[in-house]
Amino acid sequence: MEAKTNNAKIKVVIVGGVAGGASCAARLRRLDENAEIIMVEKGPYVSYANCGLPYHVGGVIEKESSLLVATPDTFRVMFNIDVRTNCEAIRILPDTKTVELRNALTGEVTSEAYDKLVLSPGAKSVRPPLPGIDLPGIFQVRTVPDARAIREWVERGSLFLAGMDKYC
C-alpha cells in the first residue's frame, strides 16, 4: 500500500468484516503500521467461521463462541483497527471519497471520508419467489444469527428439514 506523499497517514474504509474484509484489514495493517483502518460490518459479528455454521446448527460445534475467530476488540487491540459492527454502508460518493454509514441499532447516519475504499460485503442467499417463503420456519444459513435462529427453532421442538447443495 502506498503512503501519502505529504506524510499524512492513509485512511482505508473496508465495507464487510467477515472473511474477505477481516483478512484485508489484518493484511493492510501488516503492510502499513500507520494507516487509519476502519472496518464496517452490517451484522453483529466479524471474522467468524462461516463454513462452521451448519455444524453449529447440527450440534457438532456446540458453542456459538467457537465460531468466532476474532472480535472487534481483537482487531482494536492487536491491529489498531476501528471496527464498527451493526453498521451498514448505504451510499458511496466516489467524487468526494466518502461513504455514508447507518448504525443499525440507532438509525443514525454518518459520513466517513476515505483515501482507499475496499468492498467486501459478502453474499446474499437467493430466496426463490415461492409461496410461503417468508413463513415462520423457513431459514437461510449465512450468518451466526441465522444459525442461532435455527437452533432456537429446533430447541422449541419444532420440525426442521434442511437441504443444501454445496455450502463451502
Regions found by a protein language model. Give the residues of each.
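Short helix-terminating capping/connector loops at secondary-structure junctions
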Residues: 33-34, 161-163
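Hydrophobic/small residue at the entry helix of a nucleotide-binding pocket
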Residues: 19-20, 165-168
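Beta1-alpha1 glycine-rich phosphate/pyrophosphate-binding loop at the start
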Residues: 2-82, 88
